[in-house]
């Protein structure tokens, strides 16, 4: 074998060992010369290896062969691997062949596949990978923080939505209750009022009139007498049926004096007195006490040929003038089926009670209680409503237009002026000489703004209407005015406007006699004092 410096020593020793003939019993070439065989491993390790490789370890020899790329050949017979420990072991390499020693230069020892340059390249790649991973991590953290912010905002938005839904539901419930309350009032045809009883007019056929508080004056004490004409043509103006109002006179004299009072017949049509008499005696309704109800004459309209006694009481002498309690009935008309006498008593008693001190305090207390009850009802009461009522409420064809309200106001003014032109019975001579009752008091009842508000009329309209009526009656003495002109003068009233009046409970200092009479514009005069008279 040619020695070559490029061939490793192990390969040279192995080639010599296989080529020598005295070692053929331990190691030799195979039959095809492509590999070599180790026949007896134990004897080869003990006898041959120490001579060539300075050791007798067969495993170390096999490891060296593997380092140079030799492979162990496995024999397969009938699919079974033969494993004989003492049998021959064959090793093969592509460049280790019999008779071709020049191929030994191609056999190289296996070295590590890692190189410094490759390690540097891998380190750079690793650095890039780590940097990219860090960037991804930063982006992930940013995304996570943004996601957490979005979650918090979403939670706050959902909370706000839930709160708004709750508020909306509460508002819907409040609106539903308000609508139920309004529809309940419309269904029952009831309005929240201050529980003030409004008297009914006895007349059921006349037009509706405004509620005006008349000026009640004391009768004159002179000896001038007025006689009522018995004929329909004397002192009357020809006109058709104007009104069916009733003037009720209370007999305030003794029974003996009542017999001397003349009976004046009343027919179905109204009687209009002379304008000169109307100016001196405005519309007066004299109310009788309860103990004298049996002597009170009642005049009913609509019945023909039924006489009734009417009189006015006056003072017998100049020392004690007559003081008569006169109250004007409210002019609101309404249909009723009650007895006129019973209804008259209740109305008169209702008006008289408003003039008392204790009754007025009770009346103001009832107003406060009504307001508190109304507030409690609005705050705590539950209302039930039929759903069909909502359709009827908003699609109702029965609605009052402002023009209808103005027409009603005009009709009320017509009724008021007609009442002013109705017959006023003059005081007879016998009535002026009769005795006066000590329990009667003549009171000048002027327009009260609070009560006018409760009656549905503003104070300005009440005072204006009262002043206009008085001036028209006083001016009729000098110049007669036709009934048509008097009616036309009241056809353009101002529309009624609602005004809010705040009621406060009275203290003990405010509930004194002078304060209460000042509030009601009543003069707390004694029974025997003289009242100022209006200019007749």
UniProtKB/Swiss-Prot annotation:
One Gene Ontology cellular component annotation held by this UniProt entry: cytoplasm
Region span, Disordered: 300-337, 407-438
Residues annotated to bind DNA: 7-112
Known outcome of mutating residue 109 to G: Fails to translocate to nucleus
Family label: Belongs to the HSF family.
Pfam families in alphabetical order: HSF_DNA-bind (PF00447), Vert_HS_TF (PF06546)
Presence of the UniProt keyword Ubl conjugation in the record: yes
PROSITE patterns, A to Z: HSF_DOMAIN
Chief location category: cytoplasm
Motif Nuclear localization signal per UniProt: ranges: 108-122, 195-210
Region of interest (Hydrophobic repeat HR-C), ranges: 360-385
InterPro entries linked: HSF_DNA-bd (IPR000232), Vert_HSTF_C (IPR010542), WH-like_DNA-bd_sf (IPR036388), WH_DNA-bd_sf (IPR036390)
Oligomeric and partner information: DNA-binding homotrimer in stressed or heat shocked cells, otherwise found as a homodimer.
Compositional bias (Basic and acidic residues): 429-438
Protein name, per record: Heat shock factor protein 2
Keyword entries, A-Z: Activator, Cytoplasm, DNA-binding, Isopeptide bond, Nucleus, Stress response, Transcription, Transcription regulation, Ubl conjugation
Polar residues: compositionally biased ranges: 326-337
């Amino acid at each position: 074998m040619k020695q070559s410096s490029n061939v490793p020593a192990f390969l040279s020793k192995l080639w010599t060992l296989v080529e020598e003939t005295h070692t053929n019993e331990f190691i030799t070439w195979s039959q095809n010369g492509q590999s070599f065989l180790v026949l007896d491993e134990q004897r080869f390790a003990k006898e041959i290896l120490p001579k060539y490789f300075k050791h007798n370890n067969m495993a170390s020899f096999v490891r060296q062969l593997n380092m140079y790329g030799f492979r162990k050949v496995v024999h397969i017979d009938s699919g079974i691997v033969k494993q004989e420990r003492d049998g021959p072991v064959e090793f093969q390499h592509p460049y280790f062949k019999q008779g071709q020693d020049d191929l030994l230069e191609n056999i190289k020892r296996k070295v590590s596949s890692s190189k410094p340059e490759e390690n540097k390249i891998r380190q750079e790649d690793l650095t890039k990978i780590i940097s990219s991973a860090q960037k991804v991590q930063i982006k992930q953290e940013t995304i996570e923080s943004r996601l957490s912010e979005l979650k918090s905002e979403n939670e706050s938005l959902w909370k706000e939505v839930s709160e708004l839904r709750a508020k909306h539901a509460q508002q819907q419930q409040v609106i539903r209750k308000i609508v139920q309350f309004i529809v309940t009032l419309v269904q029952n045809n009831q309005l929240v009022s201050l529980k003030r009883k409004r008297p009914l007019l006895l007349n059921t056929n006349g037009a509706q009139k405004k509620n005006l508080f008349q000026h009640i004056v004391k009768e004159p004490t002179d000896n001038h007498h007025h006689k009522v004409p018995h004929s329909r043509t004397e002192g009357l103006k020809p006109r058709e049926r104007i009104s069916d109002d009733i003037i009720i006179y209370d007999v305030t004299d003794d029974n003996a004096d009542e017999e001397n009072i003349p009976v004046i017949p009343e027919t179905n049509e109204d009687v209009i007195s002379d304008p000169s008499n109307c100016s001196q005696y405005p519309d007066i309704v004299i109310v009788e006490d309860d103990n004298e109800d049996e002597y009170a004459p009642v005049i009913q309209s609509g019945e023909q040929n039924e006489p009734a006694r009417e009189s006015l009481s006056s003072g017998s002498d100049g020392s004690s003038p007559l003081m008569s309690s006169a109250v004007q009935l409210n002019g609101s008309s309404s249909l009723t089926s009650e007895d006129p006498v019973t209804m008259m008593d209740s109305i008169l008693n209702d008006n008289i009670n408003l003039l008392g001190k204790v009754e007025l305090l009770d009346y103001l207390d009832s107003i406060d209680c009504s307001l508190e009850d109304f507030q409690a009802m609005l705050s705590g009461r539950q209302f039930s409503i039929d759903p069909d009522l909502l359709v009827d409420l908003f699609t109702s064809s029965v609605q009052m237009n402002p023009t209808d309200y103005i027409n009603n106001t005009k009709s009320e003014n017509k009724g008021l002026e007609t009442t002013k032109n109705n017959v006023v019975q003059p005081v007879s001579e016998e009535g002026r000489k009769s005795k006066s009752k000590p329990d009667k008091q003549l009171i000048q009842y002027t327009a009260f703004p609070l009560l006018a508000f409760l009656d549905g009329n503003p104070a300005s309209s009440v005072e204006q209407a009262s002043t206009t009526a008085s001036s028209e009656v006083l001016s009729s003495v000098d110049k007669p005015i036709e009934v048509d002109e008097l009616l036309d003068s009241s056809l353009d009233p101002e529309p009624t406007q609602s005004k809010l009046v705040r009621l406060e409970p009275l203290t003990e200092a405010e509930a004194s006699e002078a304060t209460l009479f000042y509030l009601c514009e009543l003069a707390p005069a004694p029974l025997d004092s003289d009242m100022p008279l209006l200019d007749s």
